[in-house]
Amino acid sequence: MSTLHFEWDDRKAAANAKKHGVEFEEAKSVFVDERAKLIDDPDHSEAEDRFVLLGLSSAIRLLLVCHCNRGEGNVIRIISARKATAKESRNYP
């Protein structure tokens, strides 16, 4: 099993925490949720393929994490993270 590696822009991470109340360190934990749902995000995939992951964080919050894969797919770049809306929460398995 390969180890997950993460990266993000520190300024974006700080702005995200202020706006949405979600730290990217917490958002990382969604990637180990075995029930998380991966969703393609073609509307935001101009320069690179972007995805949204809906899953539980280590703080037991249902989060939506926008991300892309870098390198040869072994680095996950977190773009944004926020609490899932009630409507989005219904899509969690």
Where do the PLM segments sit?
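Ribonuclease/tRNase effector modules and their secretory precursors
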Residues: 1-93
